[in-house]
UniProtKB/Swiss-Prot annotation:
PANTHER family from the UniProt entry: BLR1237 PROTEIN, TRICARBOXYLATE-BINDING PROTEIN
Family recorded in the similarity comment: Belongs to the UPF0065 (bug) family.
Record-annotated membrane-spanning stretches: none
Pfam families reported for this sequence: TctC (PF03401)
Cellular-component GO terms for this entry: periplasmic space
Leader sequence residues: 1-27
Organism in which the protein naturally occurs: Pseudomonas putida
Superkingdom, natural source: Bacteria
Keywords of the record: Periplasm, Plasmid, Signal
Subcellular location: Periplasm
Statement: the UniProt record of this protein carries the keyword Signal: yes
Protein name: UPF0065 protein in clcB-clcD intergenic region
UniProt-listed InterPro entries: BUG, Bug_dom1
Length: 329
């Protein structure tokens, strides 16, 4: 006869086996219901546009609806926290960017440690940003704008989508390299920030090409330079800031990645990564992204993890050295 200890061991092993079978089954059956992508910024920005382009195609690949839901606020913290609290079952995902690498510096009381709370799935796209000013701005080029800023510390204001967002950090890096003091005005997303820029309430903004190209082409804002080392195909004739602002090697590319709660099964992550890479390889998606100034990326979940770690190091040094988390440059 089995001893009580042996019986307990058999029961325990049986429970473990059943739990493993449950995980395997959930991964094998995944997805069996609609999937939510949480975008922690308002509609209309680059991250929202990229998400909607890809969600439709991924929905077709997975055979389940993929809906994009906007949860803006606190530089992406509110939406990210919602995903961090969600079940790790692959049905609530996060689309985020540089903010996920710098939250801890700007929001020390945030309810999650991003690197522990989330697992990377795939890099979706990268987009250069563009320095823009209101259409009636006296500044015709980046050099004159920065020269005025240097002579008048704190009088040139710049908008961002929130503290720690990629467009905040891009402008802050430009200011740091140029040795100028700018006044940061954070918003709850790039869309309301752009509206105030167009209205002339702000001096400048470094925003994604995706969000700004229609305003540039309609003459509502003036583009002074792009943050890529080469001219952007979607904005021919606009020089790189490395040249236009006399800042050699200045380059900032906004990236967008797909993430899941960290406890999510690796098998589910693999399903999502495969579907995302298939979507990003289609000519339709590549053209749709190119039309809004973005470049399709893809790759392994591990590659996104490496990028994420590099961004934590890169921006952490800038934030600490220039005290950006106190809203000072």
């Amino acid at each position: 006869m089995l001893s009580r200890l042996s019986i307990r061991l058999v029961v325990w092993l049986g429970c473990v086996g059943l739990s493993l079978l449950a995980v395997t089954a959930s991964a094998a059956d995944y997805p069996s219901k609609p999937i939510r992508w949480i975008v922690p910024f308002p509609p209309g920005g680059a991250i929202d546009m990229v998400s909607r382009v890809l969600a439709q195609r991924v929905s077709e690949t997975l055979g389940q609806p993929v809906t994009v839901e906007n949860r803006p606020g606190s530089g992406g913290i509110i939406g990210s926290a919602e995903v961090a609290r969600s079940p790790a079952d692959g049905y609530t995902l996060l689309v985020n960017s540089t903010g996920l690498a710098v939250d801890k510096w700007f929001y020390p009381n945030v309810a999650y440690d991003a690197r522990k709370a989330f697992a990377p799935v795939a890099l979706l796209a990268t987009i250069p940003s563009v320095l823009v000013v209101p259409a009636d701005s006296p500044y015709k080029d980046a050099r004159s704008l920065l020269a005025y800023a240097k002579a008048n510390p704190g009088k040139v204001s710049f908008a961002s989508a929130g503290m720690g967002t990629s467009i905040h950090l891009a402008a802050a890096l430009l200011a740091a390299q140029a040795g100028v003091d700018l006044l940061h005005v954070p918003y709850k997303g790039s869309t309301p920030a752009a509206a105030d820029l167009i209205a002339g309430r702000l001096s400048m903004m470094v925003d994604s090409i995706t969000a700004q190209q229609s305003f540039i082409k309609s003459g509502r804002v003036r583009a002074l330079g792009v943050t890529s080392l080469q001219p952007a195909p979607s904005l021919p004739g606009i020089p790189p800031l490395a040249q236009a602002a006399d800042q050699p090697n200045f380059e900032v590319l906004t990236w967008f990645g797909l993430f899941v709660p960290s406890r999510t099964s690796p098998d589910i992550v693999k399903v999502l990564n495969t579907a995302m890479n298939e979507a990003l390889k289609t000519p339709e998606v590549q053209k749709a992204l190119a039309d809004i100034g973005a470049s399709a990326q893809g790759g392994t979940s591990q590659a996104l993890g490496v990028l994420w770690d590099n961004e934590i190091d890169r921006w952490g040094q800038l934030i600490v050295h220039h005290r950006l988390n106190t809203n000072e440059l």
